[in-house]
Amino acid sequence: MSGARDALERLIEARAAEKEQTLFYRALAGDAEAAGDAELAERLNGLLADEQHHLSRLTARLLELGVTLPPLDEVEAPATALADWEEAARERERQEVRRYESVPRAQLDERTAEVLEEILEAERHHVTALGGKWMNA
């Protein structure tokens, strides 16, 4: 597999992972709202907003590059538990950082590399702060 093709395949995989991440935070935010914890729900909704933004940016960039994208209908929400959400979320965010760091940059065009770096920066903030609103509109 060529370097460019490998990089695009990894971004397609990252797109599916971002979809899963949105489902993860959406479920947790709903649980927090049901538990009456408005502050936690807001925090989780901030993370959800960032992950949705990552998904949108990856989708848009891949489509701009002419990539035919697989549907995301089959991506399922992972199991969630509000009681230990921070530990699970931090590990999931670490996985996202590792995923984006592993994408070979040398074969990416400048704009795609910029999008990747912006997402990676937000994911690094998520690991340390577990809060959202790190993405620029």
Regions of interest found by a model, annotated:
Residues 1-137:
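Non-heme di-metal
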